[in-house]
């Protein structure tokens, strides 16, 4: 330990591995609310993804307690899903005409935690001159953008058999119906989280830090966003 008891301002740089859980509360297709998307599949309602991102912090060490402000940007998640379902409506036995309903769904979604600006209060446990486990609490102002584009196309396919020997069948696409839904939001909210980890003093001023943090970004309109992060970084005290 240094002569000043470890007190002073510091900067820290981390590389974090984040598990991101995004839950969208879209209404069911039969819901009466027509102002929100109702055709998206469960694939876009409940998203789990992982990313790696940098994080920087500045803080002050009071010799036991620390306060720190941090900033991070996350990777943009985007994906698409296409599905098709063919359902037989009826077959006319008297003439062999078959009618099927073909439903195509095309969904495109994006989610981006644009930024997180946090303030943490952290307590270091003095185990020995080198190791310092710590716990803390964090409040953060987060900015999130997300969008979904859902297209549902339904057509009836009529198949007419040929009366001629070895003749080809004839198909007709009738009664096409298309439903397009789009939603885009840019939201800013204050969320809460917890921090834990351990610091190892390489020198009196340089510390290797391994940490974990959980953060609930708050209620983002129809979206809930939570992150679990494991990080490794270095902290330099002036």
UniProtKB/Swiss-Prot annotation:
It comes from the Bacteria. Implicated in a number of adherence functions. OPA proteins are implicated in pathogenesis and are subject to phase variation. The keyword Metal-binding does not apply. This is Opacity protein opA60. Pfam families: Opacity. Gene3D superfamilies: 2.40.160.20. It comes from Neisseria gonorrhoeae. NCBIfam families: autotrans_barl. It is found in: Cell outer membrane. Its main location: membrane. InterPro entries: OM_autotransptr_brl_dom, OMP/PagP_b-brl, Porin_opacity. Changing residue 234 to M: In strain: MS11 / V18. GO terms for molecular function: porin activity. Keywords: Cell outer membrane, Membrane, Signal, Transmembrane, Transmembrane beta strand. Belongs to the opacity porin family. One of its GO terms (cellular component) is cell outer membrane. The keyword Transmembrane applies. Residues 1 form the signal peptide.
């Amino acid at each position: 330990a240094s002569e000043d008891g470890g007190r002073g301002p510091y900067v820290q740089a981390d590389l974090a591995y984040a598990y991101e859980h995004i839950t969208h509360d879209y209404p069911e297709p039969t819901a009466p609310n027509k102002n929100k998307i109702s055709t998206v599949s469960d694939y876009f309602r409940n998203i789990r993804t992982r990313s790696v991102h940098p994080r920087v912090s500045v803080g002050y060490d009071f010799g036991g307690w620390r306060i720190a402000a941090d900033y991070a940007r996350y990777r943009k998640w985007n994906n698409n899903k296409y599905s098709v379902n063919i359902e037989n409506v009826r077959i006319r036995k008297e003439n062999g005409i078959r009618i099927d309903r073909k439903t195509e769904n095309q969904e495109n979604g994006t989610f981006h935690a644009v930024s997180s600006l946090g303030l943490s209060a952290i307590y270091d446990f003095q185990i020995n001159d080198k190791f310092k486990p710590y716990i803390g609490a964090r409040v953060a102002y987060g900015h999130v953008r997300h969008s979904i584009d859902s297209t549902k196309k339904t057509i009836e396919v009529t198949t007419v058999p040929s009366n001629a020997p070895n003749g080809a069948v004839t198909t007709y696409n009738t009664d096409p119906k298309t439903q397009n839904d789009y939603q885009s939001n840019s939201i800013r909210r204050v969320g809460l989280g917890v921090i834990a980890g351990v610091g190892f003093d390489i020198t009196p001023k340089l510390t290797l830090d391994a940490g974990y943090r959980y953060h609930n970004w708050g209620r983002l309109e129809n979206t809930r966003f939570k992150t679990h992060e494991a990080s490794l970084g270095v902290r330099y005290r002036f």
